[in-house]
Amino acid sequence: MPPPAEEFAVDDLDEFESRLDSFLNRFHADDLRRILLPFPDGKLHFPLVIDFAELLEFDPEVAHQLYDYPKDVLELFDAAAQRALDKFDAAARRADKRKAGDETMEKKFVHVRVNTSGSALECPEASPSIGKVRVKHRGTLLTLKGTVIRSGGVKMIEGERKYQCRKCKCRFTVHPELEAGNRITLPASCKSKSAKGCGGANFQLIEDSITCHDYQEIKIQENIQLLGVGSIPRSMPIILMDDLVDIVKAGDDVVVTGRLSAKWSPDIKDVRSNLDPMLIANFVRRTNELKSDLDIPVEIINKFEEFWAASRATPLKGRNSILKGICPQIYGLFTVKLAVALTLIGGVQHVDASGTKVRGEPHMLLVGDPGTGKSQFLKFAAKLSNRSVITTGLGSTSAGLTVTAVKDGGEWMLEAGALVLADGGLCCIDEFDSMREHDRTTIHEAMEQQTISIAKAGLVTTLNTRTTVFGATNPKGQYDPNESLSVNTTLSGPLLSRFDIVLVLLDTKNKKWDKIVSSHILAENTEEKKGKTSDPEVMWTLSMLRRYIHYVKQHFKPVLTKEAERVISSYYQRQRQSGTRNAARTTVRMLESLIRLAQAHARLMFRNDVTKLDAIAAILCIESSMTTSAIVDTAGNALHSNFTENPDQECILKCDSIAYLSKNIKYLTDEISN
């Protein structure tokens, strides 16, 4: 595309405006008529969203002018929308189609909003990352994607005022310069279009002619996942006006289309003023509801269905094929891989009878000796999640994890922390034990209620933190199996009770295990092994696992069956009656954890019913967490857990074991075959 001229100019302005009218009448007549529906206040601002792809197909020249000169063309578009609105209003009145008392107030504020989704403007040139915005983009229509990290208050700003020449009484409108601190500059001489000209330079402000607009400043930051290691995420201030204000909050993922401009930095003594870039928004779209930009074609969904149709006779073997795709470079650790999958998939959020929301996202903590693969699982889980934030306990404070109150230009604003930025995704915290006790207590509310209540600098609000927390920590010194988790990890009981799964990975001496693991690591580096994968697992690559997790979370809402309820209830009662129970773990939260994990396992198994098999899988995950009060002897060490040849038959044996110890339920051994 050739570089645009310095100023907007067309050969025939009337003809250009008629083309805008034709576009609106052809594609948005119904939208304009909907704006005419009864509203209590005619001073409201109404958006009219147009599709840039439709405009480009209808009139390429107008679309190019809109890209090159968005400020001028959007003003003409707003005027065209107002003309069309007045025309439809007059036509309806003449036709007398309105009922008595259905008269509407005149709508004076209609703004054309440009949606560039699915158009040519999604190319890297017109939709760069925030860190790649340059001077060449100034004045053009730009689309930026990012996360809202700061949200200011809604203010009132002057939009225009009218003056009258004292000499010829000519009236004209003056718009403030937003880039210059909303300063108004009067013309040097009268703008009269009379043949003789006026030449007057003395103007008088017309009373009650000042028009004000709602105004809000936010700041968005580019997606951390799209950056390379060592890159600093860049941010961009965004100006929202009129109907766009207060539609996003800190932590929201947004796509913003607008005009790139610049404003002078505040005057500070002995500091040189600079031009800071800013985007004057025309259209804002929240992408929180999407949670993912993953495009799952029908062919991929058919592959999922075919896979489970082929695994109908041996469903657990099919499940294990999926689990082997998680951290394939690490041998074994079946229990950990199952727990990671269930944590990422999660259960179903619901609202109880009192109106309290019960979270569906599980939390997971890995406690283990150095070299047991904890950080590897954290990084792989972050890759599998559509939205993730990775941090370490040593480099995290309570403000950095939750929210910070910052002062900008004399006004206090809230800046989102890691848990808010990970809303709807995964927050990985490595070296969890390195956090100070005060910082750890600040995330209690974020983990259980999934909100953060803020009362800082006069700002009182609540932000969403609907995120899964995945932590990793080392034990304090040598792990003592006879002591509780609180003693071994120095983590408080209230914090431990919020983790659904706490897996302990002990690097104990095991000659057979060491030989198998060393052979696996050496085989990965031989020429014969490179580039080869086993046939059952060749399907479950990283991208396929991401699509699968996203698909089952969106399309399956499992419900517990009566048999699954009895299994979970019996196990919970057995744990509460155990003489060696851990008081910090065996609370009502453990019962909720069992339900969440059972629902997650049902999703993993590609179904909408939580069966006894899912309940037993959830119990086995919890059993691996109950290091001192496990009631199933077959739980074993999570570090040495491996994939079995016949998992379906082995599950029947574990069913019998749990049934015998629970003593409340008669298990049917044909559960899997049915």
UniProtKB/Swiss-Prot annotation:
Q: Which GO terms describe its biological process?
A: double-strand break repair via homologous recombination; meiotic cell cycle
Q: Which UniProt keywords apply?
A: ATP-binding, DNA damage, DNA repair, DNA-binding, Helicase, Hydrolase, Meiosis, Metal-binding, Nucleotide-binding, Nucleus, Zinc, Zinc-finger
Q: Where is this motif: Arginine finger?
A: 497-500
Q: Which Pfam families match?
A: MCM (PF00493), MCM_lid (PF17855), MCM_N (PF14551), MCM_OB (PF17207)
- Which InterPro entries has this protein been placed in? AAA+_ATPase, MCM, MCM_dom, MCM_lid, MCM_N, MCM_OB, NA-bd_OB-fold, P-loop_NTPase
**Which PROSITE patterns does the protein's record reference?**
MCM_2
**Protein name, please?**
Probable DNA helicase MCM9
Q: Which gene encodes it?
A: MCM9
